[in-house]
């Protein structure tokens, strides 16, 4: 079973969010272990660029495995402040450490997001 | 995400996959392993050591009867009656328009007994077509779908011969002595009988073991145990697809379809228009049939006749000497974003001129690779084309197939 840690928030599109989701705060975003397992070995991550304005629910990048390609959705609205450059050479960290070193980008929120799920609610979605 | 009303078919090895923790997927109506550990690890194991596959979804159609060889000569585009005993042959069934109904591997198990291995997605249609064509041609031959009674277990990779050898009972012929695309009945440790063929779909050396469904789990576990010290791991259909694509092998529904002739796919060599056929004379039944073994002698009851009519012959003869309207090519890109099946091949002005049939980031090459149909003017090796990869044009160039060839 894929791990779904408490203390993170989750989107319907299988992204996780770490941090306070109120305007002005900066959060870290990645994809869940469930999504990583479904995708298979990730061989390429195309994150958004630093400075991009992203909107909750919109496509902002893509992830590619040998088997499939998946769009990356932003779970929050704001400005991208940082992307995980380690994924350039080690995209498989998305599989091996989805909630840690496999983080994808950080966003400074311009608005809050009330629609994200807690671990229990997200867990129900993946059953 | 199956919405089909009929439940997915299960391999005799289903419980083995569940206990190994496989990620399962619905494939052509079957619930089959997609992966166990990881796609790239499984792909690499087959290239460098060995992988174990459950291919029990493939269709096994037994064709028997005095006219079996002549019946297949008529029903398929290849010249089955010329096959030696225990040989395997890659061939196709085409429709009257020359369109491909399925690509097949046919094994000659006896002079009057062939096993036709069909893709899971086409099994029922191929069985029905074979029976209809035998009937239409007035042949004394029968088709029996044995898929449910058999399991197909493949051991693929450079260590395959050693592993399959260790599965065989003491004193049995060494599988390593089998030629590529030939087969034998072998007795395995534990007393299980297996029809073992040196065939595969990965671009590596390998064997396919057809065994009874009732002993499949035993053979599977033996192979896992015997292969462990050789680096063998269980592998799923995801790695089978990436391996076959690197090896430039076509997949029905992607490179091959009813809208495609063997000539379009660059496989015109499978169509035999001419040549003497050696068929059993049905007027002399009952001669002693050769027993199991690696024999390739000609049956004493055989008579020689010229290659005659076969379904699709006229249509295929018309296109055989024409310049094809489309050509199947290999493409390699230097970027990282990979084309996928269905993406448009574009010219310099961004107009669609072709279509990608399969595409992946190649685990062995570390670059995106694809097969695509393009106009003959863009088919020369070295030609630069563009692929519309999810809204952005990615440059790729035509290369000779296969992308990967094992060292001899």
Could you say what each language-model-derived stretch is?
Chain A
Residues 1-59, 92, 96-127:
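Acidic, low-complexity mobile loops and tails
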Residues 14-17, 63, 72, 77-80:
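Conserved hydrophobic positions within beta-strands
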Residues 17-20, 66, 83-86:
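Residue-level recognition of beta-strand microenvironments
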Residues 33, 67, 76:
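A short beta-strand motif that forms part of the nucleic acid-binding face
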Residues 37, 77-80, 86-87:
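Short, charged/polar surface micro-motifs in flexible loops or helix N-caps
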Residues 60-61, 66-67, 86-87, 111:
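Short, charged beta-turn/beta-strand-edge "cap" motif at the junction between a beta-strand
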Residues 64-73, 90-93:
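Short, Lys/Arg- and Gly-enriched loop/turn segments at beta-strand edges
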Residues 75, 89, 117:
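Charged, alpha-helix-enriched surfaces in structured cytosolic catalytic cores
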């Amino acid at each position: 079973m894929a791990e779904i840690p408490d203390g993170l928030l989750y989107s319907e599109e299988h992204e996780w969010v770490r941090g306070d989701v109120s305007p002005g705060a900066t959060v870290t975003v990645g994809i869940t272990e469930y999504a990583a397992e479904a995708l298979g070995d990730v061989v390429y991550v195309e994150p958004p660029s630093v400075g991009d304005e992203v909107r909750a629910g919109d496509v902002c990048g893509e992830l590619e495995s040998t088997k499939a390609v998946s769009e990356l959705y932003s779970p929050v609205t704001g400005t991208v402040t940082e992307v995980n450059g380690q994924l350039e050479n080690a995209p498989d960290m998305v599989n091996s450490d989805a909630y840690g070193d496999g983080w994808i980008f950080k966003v400074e929120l311009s608005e809050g997001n009330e629609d994200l799920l807690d671990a229990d609610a997200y867990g129900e979605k993946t059953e | 995400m199956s919405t089909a009303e009929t439940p997915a078919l299960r391999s005799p090895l289903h419980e083995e996959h569940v206990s190994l923790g496989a990620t399962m997927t619905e494939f052509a109506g079957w619930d089959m392993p997609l992966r166990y550990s990881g796609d790239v690890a499984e792909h690499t194991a087959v290239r460098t050591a060995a992988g174990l596959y459950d291919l029990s979804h493939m269709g096994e159609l037994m064709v028997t009867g005095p006219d079996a060889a002549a019946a297949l000569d008529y029903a398929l585009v290849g010249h089955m009656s010329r096959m030696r005993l225990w040989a395997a042959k890659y061939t196709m069934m085409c429709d009257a328009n020359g369109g491909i109904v399925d690509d097949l591997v046919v094994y000659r198990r006896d002079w009057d007994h062939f096993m036709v291995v069909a893709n899971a997605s086409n099994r029922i249609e191929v069985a029905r077509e074979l029976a209809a064509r035998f009937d239409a041609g007035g042949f004394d031959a029968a088709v029996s779908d044995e898929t449910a009674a058999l399991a197909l277990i493949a051991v693929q990779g450079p260590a395959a011969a050693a592993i399959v050898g260790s599965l065989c009972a003491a004193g049995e012929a060494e599988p390593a002595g089998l030629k590529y695309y030939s087969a034998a009945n072998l007795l395995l440790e534990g007393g299980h009988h297996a029809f073992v063929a040196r065939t595969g779909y990965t671009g590596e050396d390998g064997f396919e073991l057809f065994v009874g469904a009732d002993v499949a789990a035993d053979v599977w576990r033996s192979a896992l145990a015997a292969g462990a010290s050789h680096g063998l791991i269980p592998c799923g259909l995801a790695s089978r697809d990436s391996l076959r694509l690197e090896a430039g092998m076509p997949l029905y529904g992607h490179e091959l379809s009813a809208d495609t002739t063997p000539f379009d796919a660059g496989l015109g060599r499978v169509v035999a228009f001419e040549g003497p056929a050696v068929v059993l004379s049905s007027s002399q039944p009952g001669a002693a049939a050769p027993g199991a073994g690696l024999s390739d002698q000609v049956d004493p009851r055989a008579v020689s006749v010229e290659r005659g009519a076969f379904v699709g012959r006229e249509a295929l003869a018309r296109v055989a000497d024409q310049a094809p309207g489309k050509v199947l090519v290999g493409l390699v890109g230097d970027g990282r974003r990979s084309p996928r099946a269905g993406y448009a091949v574009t010219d310099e002005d961004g107009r669609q001129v072709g279509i990608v049939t399969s595409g992946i980031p190649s685990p062995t090459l570390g670059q995106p690779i694809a097969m695509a149909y393009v106009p003959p003017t863009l088919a020369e090796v070295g030609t630069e084309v563009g692929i519309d990869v999810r809204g952005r044009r990615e440059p790729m160039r035509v290369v000779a197939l296969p992308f990967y060839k094992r060292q001899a």
